[in-house]
């Protein structure tokens, strides 16, 4: 279940470290690490549409989880996401979810 977290506590991702201990890291740290890894593999080439790539990697699973949480209720999902229902519908269509 998704829980709203206070602004001072960012979204976190639980992972196991090398010693099999659970470590909670802010989502942004994981995004940074993934981007660092991606950019290091480009061999000096400049990526195109990087913003859209990263946004879609985050937005799609977020929409999926919110729609599951709301049991498909688009009005409730839009309210949770802080967007209007028409925008939500466009995003769902973009990702083949609606």
UniProtKB/Swiss-Prot annotation:
A Pfam family this protein belongs to?
Answer: HTH_8
| Matching InterPro entries | Fis_DNA-bd, Homeodomain-like_sf, HTH_Fis, Trans_regulatory_Fis
| Cross-referenced PANTHER family | DNA-BINDING PROTEIN FIS
Record note on quaternary structure: Homodimer.
**Member of which family?**
Belongs to the transcriptional regulatory Fis family.
Single Gene Ontology MF annotation: sequence-specific DNA binding
Q: Coiled-coil intervals in this record?
A: none
Gene3D superfamilies in the record, alphabetically?
Homeodomain-like (1.10.10.60)
- Known DNA-binding region: 74-93
UniProt keywords, alphabetically: Activator, DNA-binding, Transcription, Transcription regulation
Report the protein name in the record. DNA-binding protein Fis
What is the stated purpose of this protein?
Answer: Activates ribosomal RNA transcription. Plays a direct role in upstream activation of rRNA promoters.
């Amino acid at each position: 279940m998704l829980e709203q977290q206070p602004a001072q506590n960012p979204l976190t991702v639980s992972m196991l470290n090398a010693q099999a201990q659970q470590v909670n890291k802010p989502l942004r740290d994981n995004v940074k690490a993934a981007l660092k890894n991606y950019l290091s593999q480009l061999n000096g080439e400049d990526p195109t549409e990087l913003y859209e790539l990263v946004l879609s990697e985050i937005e799609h699973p977020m929409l999926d989880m919110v729609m599951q949480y709301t049991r498909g209720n688009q009005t409730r999902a839009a309210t949770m996401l802080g967007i209007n229902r028409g925008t939500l519908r466009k995003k769902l269509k973009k990702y083949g979810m609606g």
